[in-house]
């Protein structure tokens, strides 16, 4: 049985409210869960301490038993200091795209041609 620490959605339409639960990975998103370990209310301001509340002892116990947090829950756990989120590296993100390279080359060529005419 593969356990996940994940979010289950509650609340009304356009007013989401999430419980952070430990559940079998095969169970539905809002289906049966083993234990509730926290809540997340995205409608509260970001600086509100009650926006995310976690029961750290329970979470640490489940992590020790092998439960895997989902990406969003791992962000919450990292912010609370309960788990470490691995750093991601995307070296191509900072590299300019194909069209940007072409525009830069055209600009450099145009600037080079302008310097020759002035000299």
UniProtKB/Swiss-Prot annotation:
PROSITE patterns: RIBOSOMAL_S16 (PS00732). Residues 81-119 are annotated as: Disordered. The keyword Ribosomal protein applies. SUPFAM superfamilies: Ribosomal protein S16. GO terms for biological process: translation. GO terms for cellular component: cytoplasm; small ribosomal subunit. GO terms for molecular function: structural constituent of ribosome. PANTHER family: 30S RIBOSOMAL PROTEIN S16, SMALL RIBOSOMAL SUBUNIT PROTEIN BS16M. This is Small ribosomal subunit protein bS16. The lineage of its organism: Bacteria, Pseudomonadati, Pseudomonadota, Alphaproteobacteria, Hyphomicrobiales.
